[in-house]
Amino acid sequence: MPQLVPFYWMNLLTTGIAAVSILLYLSATIILPNVLRLLVARAIIVRV
């Protein structure tokens, strides 16, 4: 199990931080604005 070998901790930590950072950036710049645009469009359609 590589999680228990201290040599791999830095690699796992770096990979984990990089993956979380990339996912957070993508969700904040691409996914969330599209969802917000869709919800606003639906709200406008329902009101009309």
Swiss-Prot record:
InterPro entries in alphabetical order: ATP_synth_su8_fun
GO terms for cellular component: mitochondrial membrane; proton-transporting ATP synthase complex
Protein's UniProt keywords contain Transport: yes
One of the protein's GO biological processes: proton motive force-driven ATP synthesis
First-listed, main subcellular location of the protein, grouped into a coarse class: mitochondrion
Membrane topology category: Single-pass membrane protein
Annotated keywords: ATP synthesis, CF(0), Hydrogen ion transport, Ion transport, Membrane, Mitochondrion, Transmembrane, Transmembrane helix, Transport
Pfam families: Fun_ATP-synt_8
Keyword Transmembrane set for record: yes
Subcellular location: Mitochondrion membrane
GO MF term list: proton-transporting ATP synthase activity, rotational mechanism
TM region(s), chain numbering: 12-32
Family named by the database record: Belongs to the ATPase protein 8 family.
Subunit-level organization: F-type ATPases have 2 components, CF(1) - the catalytic core - and CF(0) - the membrane proton channel.
Protein task: Mitochondrial membrane ATP synthase (F(1)F(0) ATP synthase or Complex V) produces ATP from ADP in the presence of a proton gradient across the membrane which is generated by electron transport complexes of the respiratory chain. F-type ATPases consist of two structural domains, F(1) - containing the extramembraneous catalytic core and F(0) - containing the membrane proton channel, linked together by a central stalk and a peripheral stalk. During catalysis, ATP synthesis in the catalytic domain of F(1) is coupled via a rotary mechanism of the central stalk subunits to proton translocation.
Official protein name in the record: ATP synthase protein 8
